[in-house]
Amino acid sequence: SIMSMANLEIEQAAGSNDAWFVRRGAGTPQDGLAALFRLMGVAEASPHATAPITTRRVRAGVALFHEGTCAQAVYFIAVGTFKLMHTAEDGYEQVLGFAGRAEMLGYDALCQRSYPTTAVALEDSTVYALPVADLFGLSARVPALGRVLHLAASRQMLHQVEIAHLIGLGA
């Protein structure tokens, strides 16, 4: 269902009472990509910075995306924490990590077009969603978005190195 409220559209996720999307119209500095740039610490004065961006709110215990499903978007966590996990064939769920504010989710799905993990909100959370179909074109038009993607991917790689180091030390 969709309802409009003063330049704000709320669309409930199909088949779910727990997740919903919020689309903000452009027009104020708080709207659009500028909010994502602020979250990630990237200064941008481009007129494209007010381009609308989808905000998705996810209640605690609800999956943002499921392992094996087609990658629809890359997400940046504005508020909240997510658990990333893999489910084995026997149903065993292995926690692979956690992600919090200003971290990116779903970027690892771009190379195989499906999410390799499931991301579940550990608390009521809010994410910015960048549709995969628009990601590269938008990055070409808005260079700051490319910087945000590179910064977030670099942070993820650093985090993985830290985890590998801890595992190697037996900590």
Region locations from a protein language model:
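A generic structural signal for short hydrophobic patches within well-formed alpha-helices
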Residues: 104, 135-136
